[in-house]
Structures are given as C-alpha cells and as structure tokens.
Amino acid sequence: MEKYSKIEKLGEGTYGIVYKAKNRETGEIVALKRIRLDSEDEGVPCTAIREISLLKELKHPNIVRLHDVIHTERKLTLVFEYLDQDLKKYLDECGGEISKPTIKSFMYQLLKGVAFCHDHRVLHRDLKPQNLLINRKGELKLADFGLARAFGIPVRTYSHEVVTLWYRAPDVLMGSRKYSTPIDIWSAGCIFAEMASGRPLFPGSGTSDQLFRIFKILGTPNEESWPSITELPEYKTDFPVHPAHQLSSIVHGLDEKGLNLLSKMLQYDPNQRITAAAALKHPYFDGLEPIN
C-alpha cells in the first residue's frame, strides 16, 4: 500500500470504504476501494480474486478502469481510475433538470459500457446512479462491474444502509435464479426514466413494495405478458391487479422515440427486453454526436 498515499475519504460504498489517493510514483489520482470481508478469519476467497483479476481485462472508455488489485492477508484493495462525481450527485446538483442532449449522451455511453461487458459475459447486477461516474468532459463510466459476482450483493452496505432495490428487475425481485444480461437492461431503463423525469421511477421500500410500485405503473403482469412468471419462486396468484399506464403520462421529458426505447427496456419478460447492442441502434440515438 506504500505505493499510494490517501488524500481523503470519498464515502462508503456497497462493499467498503472508498478513498481518493495518489500514486506516489506517477502522481496519478486514483480511487481506492477497500473491500470489507465478512469472513475476517478466512481471508480473501480465491474465487473473488479470480473474478477480480478478470475485471482488469475489461478495457473500454465507458468502464471505470481497474488499475490494480492489492491483496494482503485479510484485506483486498481495488485501485480504480478516479472520476469527479457520480450520476446521483449530478442529478441532485441539477435539481433533476438534465438537458435532453445530455440525457441522450449519458444513455448512449451507459449502453456502450453495458454492451461491452455483456459481450464479455460480465453482468453488473447492481446498476444505479451511484455507480455511474462522470468526469468534467461529460464522459460517463460504469463502476463496480462484476463485483456482485465476486462478492455477492449484500443486503446492507458497509455503513449499514439498505442496498437500494429501486433499479432491480422484477424477475430478480421474484426470486429468479436464472437471470442474465436483461437484468442490467431493466436497471438502465429505470436510470433513463430518472434522468428524464428528475425522480426515481420505482422508489420502493422493500421487495413487496418495490414490485407493487412496478405493477401500479406497468400493470400487473400475467402469463400472457410474461409466460414464465408462474414458475418464479415469489410469484403469487393474489397479486393486486393494476392496469398499465402510458409511460408518457409518468415520464415527462422524453420524445416519442425515447419513450419507445424506454418501453423496450422495461419489458416484464426478460426474453422480450431489448439488448444493449440493439438499444444502441435505436432511432432515439440518430444524429447523436458521440463523445468517444
């Protein structure tokens, strides 16, 4: 750890404390993520080390680079590239008012990063505004990709805050174990809606409340809209029945093409959800000037 000198604590993330630090040799500013391990006595599981090592190979302009992994007996520290702020802070500072070209640019970059990881068979599983980082050039990069697989997603964060369910796909909320890349598309759709409307689309306070909020907006799913729903562990025949609302009446700030893309991302049936690669070709992005 002598290679890095801490500058300040940036916060407490899902997995541990995050520090801003400086590489003593190069002067480069980095973010150090201290991973808290539940099994203090057992040290770092080798499966986690394997998973993390693979993440060093994920090199893409819209993915936060993992520079280094420092593994001591009881601690694991991940050294990431440093970015100025996350999308949550950005949204708070704008008072939820993001310009339409910025929404389009951020969404395109988010989907580029997701598509790249999905091509490399890496899921995120916990996409939310807090782990989308932005720099002063308007570049957006995804943080924490692949960490869920290495360490699992805890119910509570390092600082005992409850990990948010607002961006969690309904198949996961209903106990699906067979999930794949579509779970990240659902989360990206929720983030898209939040950027456009200035507020979270489904701000639930627990698993049931989360599901019911989704039902109230998108309508309660059934076997017609979602053929395999009855096979899910948490499916109940007595779910409250709600009709579907037009997304345009809830998410203001998106044009027709944007709403069309959003509806394709927020499909109940994971098999019907648009892929990241297909989303990037959607007419909503026509005429976009890419940053990278």
From Swiss-Prot:
Name by which UniProt lists this protein: Cyclin-dependent kinase 5 homolog
Activity regulation details: Phosphorylation at Thr-14 or Tyr-15 inactivates the enzyme.
Active site residues per record: 126
Domain of life: Eukaryota
Catalytic activities: L-seryl-[protein] + ATP = O-phospho-L-seryl-[protein] + ADP + H(+); L-threonyl-[protein] + ATP = O-phospho-L-threonyl-[protein] + ADP + H(+)
Similarity comment: family membership: Belongs to the protein kinase superfamily. CMGC Ser/Thr protein kinase family. CDC2/CDKX subfamily.
Domain Protein kinase: start-end pairs: 4-285
